[in-house]
Amino acid sequence: MVYSTNILLAIVTILTGVFIWSRRTYVYWQRRRVKFVQPTHLLGNLSRVLRLEESFALQLRRFYFDERFRNEPVVGIYLFHQPALLIRDLQLVRTVLVEDFVSFSNRFAKCDGRSDKMGALSLFLAKQPEWREIRTRLAPAFAGAKLKQMFSLMEEIGCDLEWYLKRLTRDLRRGDAERGAIVSIKDVCDLYNTDMIASIAFGLRSYSLRNTQSEIGSHCQDLFRPNVRRIIDLFVIFYLPKLVPLLRPKLFTEPHAEFLRRVIQLVIEERERGGDLRNDLIEMLLTLKKEADLQQDKSHFTHHRDFLAAQAASFEVAGIETCSASMSFALYELAKQPLMQSRLRREIREAFASNPNGRLTYEAVARMEFLDMVVEETLRKYPIVPLLERECTPINKKRFYSLRPHAECYTRRGMPVFISNLAIHHDPKYWPDPDRFDPERFSAANKALQAPMSYMPFGAGPRNCIGMQIGLLQIKLGLVYFLHQHRVEICDRTVERIQFDAKFALLASEQRIYLKVDCL
């Protein structure tokens, strides 16, 4: 009896302690007179995210537009017990991402270098000072001159896309000249972007557009296919980084990591034996390897066997899903607006005709103004990376960083801050009638009127997307070769309005986007 009473007393004491600790934790913003979203005990503001009712990015958008915070520069939130800030003021956004980058130079997300070296060395999640060195070493590969050199490789994949569409529409139109091909447009874009990244990042031709069962394509699909373990791993990495050393999640699954190691090693060995010289990103990785071999400090992180594979994995993550989704959303909007699609097609055909041999050139793509406008408006309405996050890292070992004069509060060392570029891109204050797809927003005259920091599909500041230019070129070439000889139309299976997937961290359609594709 006494034993049972002691157990009961211990349980009550523990629960009481947890309750008191929880109450004290959740008055953090209240004590600092910062308006905040009311948390749920133990879960903070993540209860809907944990129930898969709403992605974290969609939740931040909802908080951003909450009437209670209309005039607030910042909003307090909680990741379980961790206080965090949602930034609403654009000048404060500039301060965090650009002007005082040194105080917010790391991402909050984390991989443990002991259990997941590939994740920790990837450019996306690397911490200072490793991040700065990796970024500096990779930057030359993404310069404009390098893009021009890679253009012929990218054009090959564009031609494969056009061939694929011709075969697709020919096979499905037999016996019915008016029918066309009803396709899941994202699936087609996935094949194109898989081939593109395989070529320019891995130095391989995967031929996904000619053989949809390619090995590279299969591994890439597995990377983005959600399952329970993958969801848990990513949740811990991005929202519970303090538990990363204990739970040891991996940014890339072990089978995929091993596949990347094998592919990179084989390609590098072939290049070192005097294989074909290609102006691709693998040449840059080979240069990094040679530089590392010359260093006397063999313990330097560039000597780790996963360093090169980690960078290739970064190219893969950044170049397949994001570009595929962007292309899909652009084609969806163009299918709903045939006149806009026709205007773009005229520009595309003029670009081909500008070259005597009828081939597309890098310079011709650079001159396509309406294509630029369509892509930029797509990325405004559908920013595939819908939020930006940083960790407070004050300099000189300070514990706090003041947000004055923009907000009457401060962030403490290690605190995450979030910026909802999805919400900013849909704020009527900056973008009138934000749900309307209107490329004219990005005409030369209208771009001059845009509020600074109101358009950030690739982030901003020193830690913006290093592959922005190559990603834009990849999307543009995909649209050019898709619409050059084909048109897209809505059909009975086309969704009337895009609903975003609550289970996906990136911006993705909950339903498949079906469009009718036909030859011209």
UniProtKB/Swiss-Prot annotation:
SUPFAM superfamilies the record matches = Cytochrome P450
| Record keywords, A-Z | Endoplasmic reticulum, Heme, Iron, Membrane, Metal-binding, Microsome, Monooxygenase, Oxidoreductase
Where it sits in the cell: the answer is:
Endoplasmic reticulum membrane; Microsome membrane
Q: Does the keyword Iron apply?
A: yes
Recorded GO MF terms: heme binding; iron ion binding; monooxygenase activity; oxidoreductase activity, acting on paired donors, with incorporation or reduction of molecular oxygen
Task: Write down the required cofactor(s).
Answer: heme
CC terms in the record's Gene Ontology section: endoplasmic reticulum membrane
Instruction: Show the InterPro entries listed in the entry.
Output: Cyt_P450, Cyt_P450_CS, Cyt_P450_E_grp-I, Cyt_P450_sf, Insect_CytP450_Detox
Q: Name one GO biological process term.
A: response to DDT
Q: What are the EC numbers?
A: 1.14.-.-
Q: Which top class of enzyme applies to this chain?
A: oxidoreductase
Keyword hit for Metal-binding: yes
Main localisation? endoplasmic reticulum
**Which Pfam family is one of those matched by this entry?**
p450
- Its topology with respect to the membrane? Peripheral membrane protein
Q: Where does heme bind?
A: C465
The Swiss-Prot or TrEMBL record describes its family as follows: Belongs to the cytochrome P450 family.
Annotated function: May be involved in the metabolism of insect hormones and in the breakdown of synthetic insecticides.
Q: Which PANTHER family match?
A: CYTOCHROME P450, CYTOCHROME P450 6G1-RELATED
Know the name of this protein? Probable cytochrome P450 6v1
User: What organism is the protein native to?
Assistant: Drosophila melanogaster
UniProt lineage: Eukaryota, Metazoa, Ecdysozoa, Arthropoda, Hexapoda
Q: Which gene encodes it?
A: Cyp6v1
